[in-house]
């Protein structure tokens, strides 16, 4: 079982993908985090690819937990958000102040301060364009939808997903429903209606993704799947034929071998192909939204590998010396890097003879996650493996590069402060 609130160890990613049905990531996404397999898995990403290729509306959703520092380990989610925004994605960002209160006891006013000073200013400084940033405690649509979602799940499911026990307080138990509402509310009709939605996450957040995808499927009228042709299953009572007729009318415009069955509430297009599923599902979700306000397309997700902390384990706010904060002073960041663990050998002689182990090295992770020049990063990797590159030189080099980055972000944060009203809507 994965605990999305306190995972501290690295995962066997391939085992996790196999166990929970997470698919391999697409190879044709032109971003260095995807090319290097830092983004290692996905659910439903074919919907996002379809939206990008066909220039139709899609949403990009992420959230921030206002409980500590924004650091390089969670920066890559915003790197993805900015990338998808440039491709046409409509961005929404939730400040999880209710969740931080329920799970970590952080007062709402303190959560607001942390969110703005530690996160949002950095997002803008990184290049995020104006979008919708909101606080859970202020968003009535999210609160209302989380209440409704409670009618579509039960304690047995939440216990199985999260390991909740009778001692967990209700606010904590409700936190996953609030998070699901964060993602799904962007598809309500007053936000533009059903649309493919991508959520960049770490593997530790998969329980949330599974829950919200299941909820989206349960709440829909039309569910589409492939079984040698396209089949549409329609929820409702047998005497309600209108949705069946609508699905039949839609499929008949696109396919020639279409049948409908009122008794079993099924419409089939025998000549429909598997590659037709995504478009069909999107179109029927939009049709369904005309008489079902909860006609959600199950959200897609990208899954990234955890970044190594400078002192081992994953980079986390709970170990300050193990992270590079976006708000770190340049000299402080340099100090942390120079004291970091490495994948190097015990002596310089052994390093030259045996070569280093960059795949185990927190310092190399700084190159891999932060430097977008593929050729250069590959050269660093090969020089380390061959024994040509020494750890001291590597630390000094990346420390200088991180210093330039942090100085630039610091300057842009002050400019960003003047633009906050373009992002935070209350």
Swiss-Prot record:
GO terms for biological process: tryptophanyl-tRNA aminoacylation. It holds the Pfam family tRNA-synt_1b. GO terms for cellular component: cytoplasm. InterPro entries: aa-tRNA-synth_Ic, Rossmann-like_a/b/a_fold, Trp-tRNA-ligase, Tryptophan-tRNA-ligase_arc. It is found in: Cytoplasm. A motif ('KMSKS' region) lies at residues 314-318. A motif ('HIGH' region) lies at residues 66-74. Keywords: Aminoacyl-tRNA synthetase, ATP-binding, Cytoplasm, Ligase, Nucleotide-binding, Protein biosynthesis. One of its GO terms (molecular function) is ATP binding. Its main location: cytoplasm. It catalyses: tRNA(Trp) + L-tryptophan + ATP = L-tryptophyl-tRNA(Trp) + AMP + diphosphate + H(+). It is an enzyme of class 6 (ligase). Its EC number is 6.1.1.2. Belongs to the class-I aminoacyl-tRNA synthetase family. This is Tryptophan--tRNA ligase.
